[in-house]
Design a protein with these regions (language model features):
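C-terminal beta-signal and adjacent terminal beta-strands/loops
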Residues: 80-87, 106-152
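Generic hydrophobic alpha-helical membrane-segment signal
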Residues: 12, 18, 91-96, 113, ...
Length: 152
């Protein structure tokens, strides 16, 4: 990685959310979108002057939906990252493709005596998307996680 002396960013971000409760039911949503161009303005004599900063996508977005009922929670999230360059040279061969993941989580909270217990099962990367966040470092495919949390 490299530190850049001067970077200029120009973009637009939008966020929307909604929360609602009906008796024992709850709904929470959150959506984010960013369109942003980040460029290197460190040295006008440098051949990479005004090139896009590595790992800085033009487009990124997320959507989170959480449904709850009487101690249960079902949450899904969708994350998207657009094409981006791995190096400041901005060569096409150093382009990393866009990717998205969908995660799903089921959570239950309950009591055992005076203790609060939370059980969670998660499926991360539900669609088994093959992608690299950093060049040559592939991210895991579909994976599962079970968590049991006992608060004393």
């Amino acid at each position: 990685m490299v530190n850049f002396g001067l970077v200029k960013s120009l973009g637009l971000s939008a966020t929307a959310g909604y929360d609602r409760q009906w008796g024992k039911f709850s709904l929470s949503t959150n959506a984010n979108y960013t369109c942003q161009r980040d460029r290197d303005y460190s040295s006008p004599a440098d051949p990479e002057y005004k090139n896009t900063i590595p790992y800085s996508p033009l487009h990124s977005a997320s959507l989170i939906l959480d449904l709850g009922y009487d101690g249960y929670s079902l949450c899904t999230s969708w994350l998207y990252t657009g094409d981006r360059f791995a190096l400041i040279s901005n060569n096409r061969e150093d382009m990393l493709g866009d990717w998205y993941t969908i995660d799903l989580k089921l959570n239950k909270q309950f009591h055992i005596g005076k203790h609060n217990v939370q059980a969670t099962i998660e499926c991360n990367n539900l669609t088994d998307s093959r992608h690299e966040v950093v060049k040559r470092y592939p991210m895991p495919g579909r994976n599962w996680k079970f968590t049991l949390q006992w608060k004393i």
